[in-house]
Amino acid sequence: MVNKSDLVPKCSFCGETEDKVRKLVAGMSAFICDRCIALCSNVLSEEITLEAVSAERFTPKDIKKYFDSFITAQEDAKKILSVAVYNHYKCFVGNRLNSKDVEITKSNILIIGPTGCGKTLFAKTLARFLNVPFAICDATSITEAGYVGDDVENILRMLLQSADYNVEAAQKGIVYIDEIDKISRKSDSPSITRDVSGEGVQQALLKIMEGTIASVPPQGGRKHPNQETIQIDTTNILFICGGAFVGLDNIIANRQSINTMGFKSELQSKEVSPTILKKVEPEDLVKFGMIPEFVGRLPVIGVLDELTEDNLVEILSVPKNALVKQYVCLFGMDNIQLSFSDEALKTVARAAIKRKVGARGLRAIMESVLRNYMFELPSNKDVKTLIITEDIVRAEMANT
């Protein structure tokens, strides 16, 4: 006689019956429940994530070589970031293997540099090289809990989305926080009144940057007591913060003047050296308005140089994803051979410098130069060659 219990579908792995699980998926000759599926997924994702960022697979020189393919100049910053990232991913691999011996703490990164010099590009290139989830946010959109705006957990939600809600993968990802200098506190002394978008945000960021178990609302928005949340361990998430820090050069120069002269000698009309930012110390960042505890969470500092005309010309034409190569490809799809004279590229670079937009503004300038040609030429099958000269660049920019 057949036992009735034998007729009830059950998981072939854990043995739970259909009425005791949420879902039971049927195969040709077996069943698997939702719990066992989740368990298998976590095991596989952990192995894949560790493989993707295993420190044995790359060296600092490998990282720098990859930077060189996409980023022009900035040699010092490339080396600093290459070493910092290499050590970071050695940390969590080493901590897993030697959990009872020495625990290595992570070193988050601060990138200082003017607008359009490549701060965001560094972070994006790193994430692409490491093949890990990446999220980018603007520090000015974050406010303290209880106030209008995003709270710090929303940063982690974006990282979780980038990882397709794979928690294990997200916990090995990279977060880039832009405009970090905009959340400096309003005065040197600790604030007595509430500063919801300055010192308060720095305080809120401290825990997740150091390492904590954060409760993240999967749908975004402010948390409320009855809301479902996802737990994320931020211990191995690499945080990279970037900002222009306008005025920091004067703070450094004044400190050096005090140390040299023995008394306070405020700089009046004396021009500050463009390389002085590379001499930044934690105390200068505190003077700027970053709280000491926050500065302490960013022990690695990379300073980017302001891009010169030659740098911008190189950015236009040399990297793998250079704009000139992109437009040559686009015109080539219409069987048009596009080229630029050297003077044309120099004129584009000078325009970016004049507008103070750096490399970030190059695409907008190139679009304004090529827009009419991209509109007219696809309809004109007789044109096979287009050479952009200095005169064309000047004329097209004058018309926009």
From Swiss-Prot:
Gene Ontology BP annotations: cell division; proteolysis involved in protein catabolic process
Residues holding Zn(2+): C11, C14, C33, C36
Binding site for ATP: P114, T115, G116, C117, G118, K119, T120, L121
GO cellular-component term (any): HslUV protease complex
Listed Gene3D superfamilies: 1.10.8.60, ClpX chaperone, C4-type zinc finger domain, P-loop containing nucleotide triphosphate hydrolases
Quaternary assembly: Component of the ClpX-ClpP complex. Forms a hexameric ring that, in the presence of ATP, binds to fourteen ClpP subunits assembled into a disk-like structure with a central cavity, resembling the structure of eukaryotic proteasomes.
Keywords (A to Z) from UniProt: ATP-binding, Chaperone, Metal-binding, Nucleotide-binding, Zinc
Protein name per its UniProtKB record: ATP-dependent Clp protease ATP-binding subunit ClpX
Function of the molecule: ATP-dependent specificity component of the Clp protease. It directs the protease to specific substrates. Can perform chaperone functions in the absence of ClpP.
Recorded GO MF terms: ATP binding; ATP hydrolysis activity; ATP-dependent protein folding chaperone; protein dimerization activity; unfolded protein binding; zinc ion binding
Name of encoding gene: clpX
Pfam families xrefs: AAA_2, ClpB_D2-small, zf-C4_ClpX
Similarity-based family: Belongs to the ClpX chaperone family.
ClpX-type ZB domain: residues covered: 1-52
Source organism: Neorickettsia sennetsu (strain ATCC VR-367 / Miyayama) (Ehrlichia sennetsu)
